[in-house]
Amino acid sequence: MLECIHDIIFEYKYKGGTIMVYIESPSTNPAFNLALEQYVFDRMDRSQEYFMLWQNDNTVVIGKNQNAFAEVNQKVADAKHISVVRRLSGGGAVYHDLGNLNFTFILNAKDATDLDIRLFCQPIAELLRSLNVPAEVNGRNDISIEGKKFSGNSQYLKQGRIMHHGTLMFHSDLSVVADVLNVSADKFQSKAAKSVKARVTNIAPYLP
């Protein structure tokens, strides 16, 4: 793993000259990518901050406390060769494919203010708005366009170190999202939310 990381890390300056290590995964294997995240979080130099970009082939990623049988339509997953993996952080199940880009920040958390998910999500929304995409941070951990989610985010905290990761759906297959994820009845209180597909969207159609 260490040799692989040495081949794919780069450094760039941000926040007035502070060095952040950039890691771009060469793999679309979900097991590899989640292992890479954990390795960087647990084993890499804690004096450094890290930013990762990665993609998974067709995969459902469930939160650390979720029941896979409750969250995933296993028949659909098997038929479509969709992997099911568990991440370190909590939160809900999300679908990944190559139309989705995942990002991860790993840094030291000085106090509770560093755990505010909006600190990570708001710059993404602002960047998209600068491109005339009407993105908004809403709820506890989502970024949406016109009320439809395109980014889910979650965090993991251990010994003063925080991992924040999220999804960016550019051109994911929304029909698969609807088929493979089970949604509890309380998610459908709004009459506008007729299906999973009705509540999610891609970024690409809104880009100029």
What is each residue range found by the language model?
Residues 50, 56-59, 65, 82, ...:
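Membrane helical hairpin/interfacial module
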Residues 17-69, 155, 180, 200-208:
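Active-site loop/lid in soluble adenylation, ligation, and acyl-transfer enzymes
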Residues 71-93:
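Active-site cofactor/substrate anionic-group-binding motifs, chiefly glycine-
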Residues 3-19:
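Short, Lys/Arg-enriched N-terminal segments with co-localized hydrophobic residues
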Residues 100-141:
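Contiguous, small/hydrophobic- and glycine-enriched helical/loop subdomains that border
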Residues 137-154:
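Beta-rich nucleic-acid/ligand-interaction surfaces
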Residues 88-108, 186-205:
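Residues forming anionic-ligand binding surfaces in small-molecule and nucleic-acid pockets
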Residues 124, 131-132, 151, 159-208:
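Long, positively charged amphipathic alpha-helical accessory segments at protein N-termini or as interdomain linkers
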